[in-house]
Design a protein with these regions (language model features):
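Catalytic cores of soluble metabolic enzymes centered on carboxylation/carboxyl-transfer
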Residues: 1-292, 365-366, 370-373, 379-407
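Short, conserved beta-turn/loop elements at beta-strand boundaries and strand-helix junctions
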Residues: 317, 361-364
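A residue-level detector for short acidic-glycine micro-motifs
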Residues: 314, 340-343, 358-360
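Acidic, low-complexity mobile loops and tails
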Residues: 272-335, 347, 353, 404-405
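Structured core elements
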Residues: 8, 15-17, 303-305, 338, ...
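Short hydrophobic beta/alpha edge segments that flank linear recognition/processing sites
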Residues: 325-349, 365-385
Length: 407
């Protein structure tokens, strides 16, 4: 069946139900169902990612938390902070800075280190970019991997094997290897080869030397060659370990962003109630972050675009006058039109003050789409737009500050 959704809602998601032997098992089942669920369509917007991130927020803390109806808006505000932060970070700049630092630190063979990092670039950056493009997925990943990183003396480091974290990330994003899927929907073959080799290497390391966790692996390499291993073989093992770990520090960019925004400040108290940071309860701040989480369509300074699809009404009722007409001056917060979605009538307010030059939608009950031009206007104040070069410079500067937390 082909149909159009006029908002971020779909009953196919709302009616999902899972069961388990425990509350946590039921949550884990729900996380897996949401992970495997795919809805396809033209201009499709649903709340699937929101639910996926929210379920992992509880799994990463405790499924026994007792949130009230007050919880969702502060939670969405925290996710909005992640969205804002993601827009201020350039992953490619972070990667170049990390690679430069690692090559400079290499004593024996800089060329090999440079080649190793180049071979792993897409393996490491592709999932990070996908997470940063979806703040709800990023929220879920940060919740799931809170214990995978530790912050000591102003610096991040791994508390779990980064290779395992990376493998789990591909699964989290449903990018597992498959011979039947298009390349866009799975890990690429050359990246899969590197990741599989790394997983096999650490599995063999565990079998041979009894390394059950990341701490044991670190202790193994710090203590020197085991008696059962020749110096030549041990040198080869060390080289393989260094190669597989090279560049994985880029994963620490994500918890660095979480630390910068205070993502983990929204927490569960010992009595299972929710602890709210004051900033997440501020109404004006909540509205600002909601725009970061669901940004309105990009418009020129002399136009107003439809924030969502639906049915357009230019007046309160059939007998009422139009909200605005050509030549009408409006203030920020004045109603401009009403959009109806699934029998819900939402009044859309002016984001700034200005004068209507032209109304581009004729009549009431007209179906509009998100991003459609509705009004030509002359704003009271000219909006200063930053150039691409200025935006790029600001992102690079902020990214460099974050990179200092893990290099």
């Amino acid at each position: 069946m082909n149909y159009t959704l006029a908002g971020a809602y779909d009953s196919n998601i709302a009616l999902l139900l899972t069961v388990g032997d425990s509350r946590e098992a039921a949550y884990e089942q729900m996380a897996e169902v949401l992970r495997a669920t795919r809805l396809r369509g033209r201009d499709l917007q649903t709340n699937l990612a929101f639910h996926y991130g929210l379920v992992h927020w509880f799994l990463g803390r405790t499924v026994n938390a007792r949130p009230t109806t007050q919880f969702i808006v502060p939670y969405l505000t925290a996710v909005g902070e992640l969205a804002q932060e993601a827009g201020q970070v350039d992953v490619d700049v972070a990667w170049r800075l990390l690679c430069s630092a690692r090559v400079d630190a290499e004593v024996h063979d800089k060329a090999s280190m440079r080649a190793t990092l180049a071979a792993k670039e897409s393996l490491l950056l592709r999932p990070i970019k996908q997470l940063m493009s979806s703040p709800h997925l990023l929220s879920g990943w940060l919740s799931l991997n809170k214990a995978a990183f530790q912050f000591e003396e102003g610096h991040f480091s791994s508390a779990e094997n980064p290779i395992e974290v990376l493998s789990d990330t591909y699964h989290f994003l449903r990018l597992d290897w498959s011979e039947s899927l298009p390349a866009a929907n799975m890990i690429w073959d050359h990246d899969q080869h590197i990741l599989t080799e790394a997983e096999d290497f650490y599995a063999e390391l565990g079998r041979r030397y009894g390394c059950e966790d990341w701490l044991a692996i670190q202790n193994l390499f710090e203590s020197g060659a085991p008696e059962s291993t020749s110096d030549e073989e041990w040198a080869s093992i060390i080289a393989a370990h260094r190669g597989f770990q090279a560049g994985t520090e880029i994963l620490e960019l994500l918890p660095s962003m979480a630390r910068f925004t205070g993502f983990y400040d929204l927490a569960v108290n010992p009595d299972m109630t929710i602890s709210f940071p004051e900033r997440l309860l501020d109404t004006a701040y909540q509205k600002a972050m909601s725009k970061c989480l669901a940004p309105p369509p990009v418009a020129k300074s002399d136009e107003i675009l439809a924030a969502s699809g639906g049915m357009f009404y230019g007046r309160e009722s059939p007998e009422a006058p139009l909200y605005v007409e050509p030549g009408h001056h409006f203030e920020a917060g004045d109603p401009l039109y009403i959009v109806e979605v699934m029998k819900m009538f939402n009044k859309v307010l002016a984001p700034f003050a200005g004068t209507i030059e032209e109304v581009l939608v004729e009549g009431d009950g007209v179906i509009i789409s998100k991003g459609q031009q509705l009004f030509k206007v002359t704003p009271d104040e000219k909006v200063e737009v930053l150039s691409e070069a200025e935006i790029s410079a600001a992102r690079s500067k902020h990214t460099a500050e974050l990179v200092k937390l893990f290099i």
